[in-house]
A protein has these predicted regions:
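N-terminal secretory signal peptides that target proteins for export/translocation
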Residues: 1-9
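Bacterial N-terminal signal peptides
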Residues: 11-25
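A sensor for short, sequence-defined functional sites
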Residues: 29-652
């Protein structure tokens, strides 16, 4: 999110803030509720949204950047029993960037009588993104039933003295019959808006009318959410608003100017290489190779306290620990801590102090939105990384994100454009995508089958590369109990039958280059099923989550994988006495001619041991929906292979 600090004399200085843009706006809360028509009360279905559990009858969002306030009004029609869940309301917001208040709500019964909301509003954490804590005001409306209308309104206050880039999200989770939007811009900055996906059919583009930007929409289809799709907000109809100090319609000139300004700010923060030489001398040896020096500096920065990824502090802790802002890497060194961006700046300074060429690059992560240069939105460059030229090749590094292996980037910074800063405005460089073999899950199991058909034994899982990194980041602030539950739940989701699992080791949650290794005791009651004098065992023990992928025959959205990966299983199963192997499952091998996916299984036996191998490789990121049938066929082949049977019979 980009913000602008306002001074008493007028416009201030642009600064970047990482995070999501705020959901904003509505009508003045002092106004009366809108009238309710008989037609809306009697409505039982919406022909333009067949089968919908509920619809938005009306939405209004009014934002006033001159007063740092948004007003939001929402009215829904509950059409089915399933739709009653929309009586539980969540209003998301970032605590550090504003607050939600003046909440009013009511339920309109099918007979037109009113049940006002007079209950309690709660606050809960619902997500964390880039270190910013996303909270929600939550409440439950009274007497919500099929046929009723629920409506609520609230006011969002931004911090005084700041204005924020913003957006209107026109697509919602439900069909929207009618919606109105307005924005009163701050008059001392140029404001530009864009519509990345255009506008909903039948609606007109936003217009500037008497000092306000206005838009009305109607009959906007519900947004279709599907598994493995790009970030939702990237696919929704929306209007992005961006404040600029000076209007610049040419993207090339815009980014050149922005790059020069960013380079100047970075240079001031990083300082001169010679200033870092005393620190570098304590970290590296003169005889170290260039790569060894770089690795040591990387490890030195990565182990520093990273305030971006700490747990959310209480208000009391914030007041107690309040510190003046860092103005240079010297401040970061003095404190021994910094946020993710500051640590990457320190890494640049130390690498330069060691005689290496290191440049800071601004990057747009691809977990919430995709970066588009033509939109000229600096707020989309919401993170940074470091590019080091080592022996003629560029290394892309990010010690500012914990547990990132040396030579890799966090998954959401791979395969995207980055602006490598220099005094001429910078240059665009694509960040690398790691090879498919760099991120793996390797499962190894030694199991015994008893005469009742239950499997017991030991399972070892090695999470490698990005598969380890994202898990370590996700669990960084959790205790031992939650981490154990996290790993055990991952196993349970991959086995179709009820599995009893117990973690038996202490995984290394603080590592980065090393795999995350978890060891378990495992029991699967009744894995073998009896039919007559034979027993049947499904060969694909750990493939349940893959087998459930892309079950639907139709697809609306593109397919999106976070990063390329490989999964491999190596299972040795000991058969019980008195049982012989009647037949092994068929071997399977399926692969795309372009090597973007492959699947292979094999089975063999020796004496009373059965050896099963399984390999799955996904080497793609973004796939158009038109290729869904081919990809679905592949996963159906995976399902077929995993459902192959081992057949056992009584020994003579």
């Amino acid at each position: 999110m980009r913000s602008v600090k306002l001074s008493a004399r007028g416009p201030g200085i642009l600064s970047l803030l990482a995070g999501l843009n705020l959901l904003c706006s509505n009508q003045a809360l002092s106004a009366d509720w809108l009238p309710v028509t008989t037609e809306d009360l009697q409505m039982t279905r919406e022909p333009k949204a067949p089968g919908a559990p509920a619809i938005y009858l009306y939405r209004q969002e009014d934002r006033d950047d001159t007063e740092s306030v948004d007003n939001v009004y929402v009215r829904l029609k509950i059409l089915t029993e399933e739709g009653r869940k929309y009586g539980d309301v969540e209003i998301p917001y970032f605590k550090d960037l504003g607050n939600v208040g003046s909440i009013e709500a009511r339920t309109i019964r099918p007979d037109g009588s009113i049940a006002p909301f007079d209950g309690k509003v709660y606050e809960k954490a619902i997500a964390a993104a880039h270190g910013a804590k996303l909270l929600a005001k939550t409440f439950t409306l009274p007497e919500v039933q099929s046929g009723c209308i629920v409506e609520y309104r609230y006011r969002y206050h931004s911090p005084p003295g700041w204005i924020f880039d913003s957006r209107w999200l026109l697509s919602q989770d439900l069909f929207t019959r009618y919606a109105k939007y307005s924005l009163t811009p701050y008059p001392y900055f140029s404001l530009r808006w864009s519509l990345p996906l255009g506008i909903p059919p039948g609606s007109n583009a936003p217009l500037l009318d008497h000092g306000k930007i206005r838009l009305e929409t109607h009959d906007v289809p519900a947004f279709v959410s599907e598994e493995l799709m790009p970030p939702e907000n990237e696919l929704k109809y929306r209007v992005d608003f961006i404040y600029m100090g000076k209007a610049q319609p040419d993207p090339v000139k815009f980014w050149k100017s922005f790059g020069q300004k960013s380079f100047h700010e970075m240079s001031q923060f990083v300082g001169y290489p010679k200033d870092m030489e005393p620190v570098v001398a304590k970290v590296v040896q003169p005889t170290d190779s260039a790569e060894t020096k770089l690795r040591k500096i990387y490890a030195y920065v990565a182990q520093m306290r990273n305030t971006t990824y700490e747990r959310q502090k209480t208000e009391e802790e914030v007041k107690r620990d309040r510190q003046s802002p860092d103005h240079s890497v010297k401040d970061v060194l003095k404190r021994g801590s910094g946020d993710a961006s500051e640590l990457n700046n320190l890494f640049v300074a130390l690498a330069r102090g060691a005689g290496l060429r290191a440049d800071l690059a601004l990057v747009g992560t691809r977990d919430e939105y995709f970066f588009h240069r033509q939109l000229m939105n600096p707020g989309q460059l919401n993170a940074n990384l470091v590019i080091v030229n080592l022996d003629g090749r560029n290394l892309f590094l990010n010690p500012g994100v914990p547990f990132t292996p040396f030579g890799m980037l966090p998954w959401n910074e791979t395969a995207v454009d980055s602006l490598r800063l220099d005094d001429d405005g910078g240059s665009w460089v694509s960040t690398p995508l790691p090879p498919v073999s760099a991120s793996r899950i390797e499962r190894s199991a030694q199991l015994k089958l008893d005469r009742n058909g239950s499997l017991t034994g030991k399972l070892t899982i090695r999470y490698i590369g990005l598969e380890a990194a994202w898990r370590r980041v996700a669990e960084r602030n959790e205790d031992e109990t939650n981490r154990r539950q996290f790993l055990e739940d991952g196993i349970k989701s991959s086995v179709s039958a009820g599995v009893q699992i117990k973690l038996t080791n202490s995984p290394d949650w603080r590592g980065s280059d090393e795999p995350l290794v978890a060891e378990f005791e495992l029991e699967i009651p009744g894995w073998a099923t009896a039919a007559g004098h034979k027993q049947f065992l499904k060969a694909g023990l750990f493939g349940s989550s893959d087998d459930r992928t892309f079950e639907g025959s139709m697809r609306t959205q593109p397919i999106y994988f976070d990063f390329p990966y490989q999964h491999s299983d190596d299972i040795v199963m000991e058969l019980p006495a008195g049982v012989k192997l009647a037949s092994l499952p068929k071997n399977h091998k399926v692969a795309a001619s372009t090597a973007v996916y492959s699947y292979e299984t094999s089975a063999d036996a020796h004496d009373n041991l059965v050896h099963l191998s399984r390999y799955l490789s996904i080497n793609m990121l973004l796939v158009e929906a038109k290729y869904y049938p081919e990809l679905r066929n592949f996963y159906q082949s995976v399902r077929t292979g995993d459902e192959e049977q081992i057949v056992l019979a009584a020994a003579p």
